Amino acid sequence: MADTAHQCTIVGIAGASASGKSLIASTLYRELRAQVGDHNIGVIPEDCYYRDQSDLTMEERYKVNYDHPNSMDHALLYQHLCELKAGNAIELPQYDYVAHTRKSETIHFKPKKVIIIEGILLLTDKRLREEMDFSIFVDTPLDICLMRRIKRDVNERGRSLDSVIEQYNKTVRPMFFQFIEPSKQYADIIVPRGGKNRVAIDILKAKIGQFCE
């Protein structure tokens, strides 16, 4: 049943892979949740909307360009944002980074006063931009992003060092310059230095906190 009295503010956080988007989103969520409660704020990672690839072999999945907009099911994400804004709950997909496809289970996600969505390609899609009440681009030097990506993918996602570097050179870096960096022009706020920028986080927290009241 829809919550007709519900008003939902969508905040988008974009930027390069391993730029600090998730850290900013989780920091804002953690600190604001302590102030306004879990029912008023939530986070949706764009990664949840990687396309289901259960019909592909593992070899075919390895060859997919996961940094290209076509790898994302933005149509479903757009539909879910519209549902949440209408006061309806959604079934949030879950993605398996080891199997390179969606998990069978979903998470029941209820509408919130503020929903933070974060991901590399969010600002490349006009439909998604139009659903955002304001947007942020995390601007972190690519060499720092690469070091963070290596650490994350090897330690958390079961990747080999060689595979991470190969993917970075083949798709991550080229797609950044083709799609992600140009989408910076659509951001309302640009945050340098990623999640280490405490001043920016405090400013964003104050701004987003207004919508949680």
Swiss-Prot record:
Pfam families, A to Z: PRK (PF00485)
Example of a GO biological process term: CTP salvage
GO MF terms, alphabetically ordered: ATP binding; cytidine kinase activity; uridine kinase activity
Keywords: ATP-binding, Cytoplasm, Kinase, Nucleotide-binding, Transferase
Pathway annotation: Pyrimidine metabolism; CTP biosynthesis via salvage pathway; CTP from cytidine: step 1/3; Pyrimidine metabolism; UMP biosynthesis via salvage pathway; UMP from uridine: step 1/1
Gene3D superfamilies: P-loop containing nucleotide triphosphate hydrolases
EC numbers for this chain: 2.7.1.48
Keyword ATP-binding: yes
Subcellular location: Cytoplasm
Protein name per Swiss-Prot or TrEMBL: Uridine kinase
